[in-house]
Curated annotation (Swiss-Prot):
The keyword Transcription does not apply. This is Proton-coupled zinc antiporter SLC30A8. The gene is Slc30a8. A motif (HCH Motif) lies at residues 51-53. One of its GO terms (cellular component) is Golgi membrane. Zn(2+) 2 binds at residues 52, 300, 317, 350. Belongs to the cation diffusion facilitator (CDF) transporter (TC 2.A.4) family. SLC30A subfamily.
Amino acid sequence: MEFLERTYLVNDQATKMYAFPLDRELRQKPVNKDQCPGDRPEHPEAGGIYHCHNSAKATGNRSSKQAHAKWRLCAASAICFIFMVAEVVGGHVAGSLAILTDAAHLLIDLTSFLLSLFSLWLSSRPPSKRLTFGWYRAEILGALLSVLCIWVVTGVLLYLACERLLYPDYQIQAGIMITVSGCAVAANIVLTMILHQRNFGYNHKDVQANASVRAAFVHALGDVFQSISVLISALIIYFKPDYKIADPVCTFIFSILVLASTVMILKDFSILLMEGVPKGLSYNSVKEIILAVDGVISVHSLHIWSLTVNQVILSVHVATAASQDSQSVRTGIAQALSSFDLHSLTIQIESAADQDPSCLLCEDPQD
């Protein structure tokens, strides 16, 4: 019969940390063979203990989301490559700068999709002694690089559009342009459908979108705008050949919309890199949940942040009465917070008699 060996940290009244193995408790209760290591027992006994890190449910959710993200990115890459080649050929034949620049946008998208796939693989690597949290943030860095690619290619489009406004000496085959741009719109709509994810946040008991797929979705959404601009300009030029200026004008307008679409994703990722509270979680609500646990007198040094989207970490200092069993309090807090599927939970138990009301580090953060 196999037994799990676990080690827990409990803070004594002098706030010194001691580590001790809980061999006695583990000998009393064998491990369920059908239960994943680190998962919480279905029916913990009174005073029972379960592992402090993420549950098997959270681990399974992470693996499932990674698999879905990889499938979506692979499918998007294949579609993107096919229609990129089609637009290069069609744009060259039609003599349309808008189609060629849209093909260039697809090339950047393809590069970003492959970069996102690489970052997903990198984020699945195990932690090292130097990178103790692992490579999860590689997913965010890859997504930010993807946004940077959007800015670069959109800047090029704006420059070329301005150049055509100043020097309108060019010819366009509007018929071919309509056919190619129409197919591009359809292809990009398919891309957005593949990459679209639901994003309700924790209050709706749903998960937030994968960072890499979310950035890829913004790319595809930008491609839809760009392709629509090409199609609109093609229709205008087809019916009114003298209005070929519509080609650079539409490119200019929808390039601005593409830039605007990246602002929100950049804001969310910046907050994540600044160790902000994850979107959908409320600091005050989490604190109230902890205070509601039997034996908890006060809560301070509560920190909530994310390694990456859906990888939430929480650490907290909890003051209890000297007569209170620290292990039962820790277990109660972990059970109360289990609905959040935390990646890692650290609880430091302290004596209420040792609290210092004048300590600035123990004060609640500002609103």
